[in-house]
Amino acid sequence: MSTLKVGTIQDHANSITAMTIDSSGRILTPARPLFSAYRDSSGVEGLTGTIVFNATRSNVGSHYNASTGKFTAPVTGNYQFNFVGMGSENSSGAALAASTAVYATLYNETTSTNLARGYAVVNGQTSYPNLSFSSIQPLSANDVIRIDVGSRYVYSDGSDIWLLFSGHLIGYL
């Protein structure tokens, strides 16, 4: 049996670190594509159509575009995406009316395919229903992914906690 002892694995030509192993044995992959985006607004609003999450907490590899709200897969692989949002009645961010439905869709713009959907119907009192979902999707390099909202709106305000979109590469196919 052989033992390979390394602390860092780098690209031979450019010295780009692909992986490190820390003193506790944890594997770190600093070049793995990931993003965490949110909607930064000046006040309460309701949004529909393609949602532009215009600010990021992290964007490793810069594959998420905060101007368009779109993520472009840099490589073919399995990706996990997460969406957090609440339904809203209108562009003013009002609570969704009773007996009303709203949905948010993870959409592959390149293949014109709906990949996942969060759906809510308000039964009874007016409220802000949860539209959150998580999905693992196989993507090809250069697939463009976005969140679309239909039927009504999603709620956003001046905080960065109500409307979130994130994703990361799990592994290559």
Locate predicted features:
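Extracellular jelly-roll beta-sandwich "head" domains, especially the C-terminal globular C1q domain
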Residues: 2-7, 11-16, 24-173
